[in-house]
């Protein structure tokens, strides 16, 4: 689907979540009622109202798109699109792939450019198999750096304060991703 020059299918998942949240706000209302479990006793549930305009896409300070693999090579990553997310999480046609296979495939799909001091290689110039081979040859230390890219990438986030009615203890609760807001 293309809308005014924007390919919706290629947008990062966090942009899609933000758009979905705002479309929902315009159609159903600006406030969302959620039930939060109090962190102090992990059992008391408290209803909370959140206003959509308070929910933001948050980017971690530790987040980097450029991952230094060694002194001579840097890997630039791109965010997973909605299509990539769906293919890697809901592909019912390929049940033979393990979680590890799907993780490696997602990482390979999110490669953008590989840089050395002399050259740069655009990942689109290489087949999916070649990109996968590149990812598979990373050391565990290098792969952990790539994992940080995904762990720290932007996401919908909102912190709320709740008071447990039983213990009167105040706690902060962080809600992240659509599941926390609509789950």
Predicted feature locations:
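Long C-terminal interaction/binding lobes of large macromolecular proteins
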Residues: 1-183
């Amino acid at each position: 689907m293309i809308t005014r020059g924007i390919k919706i299918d290629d947008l990062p998942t966090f942009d899609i979540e933000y758009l979905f949240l705002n479309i929902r706000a315009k159609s159903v209302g600006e406030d969302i009622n959620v039930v939060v479990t109090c962190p102090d006793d992990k059992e008391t549930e408290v209803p909370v109202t959140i206003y959509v305009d308070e929910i933001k896409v948050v980017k971690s300070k530790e987040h980097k798109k450029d991952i230094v693999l060694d002194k001579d090579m840097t890997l630039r990553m791109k965010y997973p699109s909605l299509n990539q997310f769906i293919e890697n999480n809901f592909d019912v046609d390929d049940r033979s792939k393990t979680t590890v296979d799907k993780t490696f495939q997602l990482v390979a799909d999110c490669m953008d450019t590989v840089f050395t001091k002399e050259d740069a290689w655009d990942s689109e110039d290489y087949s999916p198999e070649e990109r996968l081979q590149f990812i598979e040859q990373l050391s565990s230390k290098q792969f952990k750096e790539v994992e940080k890219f995904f762990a720290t990438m932007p996401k919908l986030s909102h912190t709320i304060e709740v008071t447990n009615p039983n213990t009167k203890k105040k706690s902060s609760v962080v809600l992240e991703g659509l599941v926390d807001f609509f789950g």
